[in-house]
Amino acid sequence: GQLRAEGRRDEAVKLYRELAKDVRTKEGSEAAYYVIESTFGSGDMDKTEKEVFAFSEREPQAYWLAKAFILLGDVYVKKGDNFQARATWQSVADGYSPADDGIVDEAKARIAKLN
């Protein structure tokens, strides 16, 4: 997170890509999520969407997978597809546990903003 905090995004993403080779570990999943978040930040919604689905197929840690799907909902909003965004966030809110680590609240807050 230090490189990210200092605004050295390119260096950070390079490091995250390396760490993200094994997403079965917490660090690998977290790193992969930050790579996806960086793509989202660059404004490429189609690529972000593809990266989320590719990430989901690699058996990542549940917390970071849920974060990625929350971000996917943000992608759908940017693409003007609020219906798909709501469905994505609702599936996270309904299907994710534990309920107390912030993920479910984050999904529900996104849904509330759409109303």
Locations of regions flagged by a protein language model:
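Acidic, polar-rich low-complexity tracts and alpha-helical solenoid repeat scaffolds
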Residues: 1-115
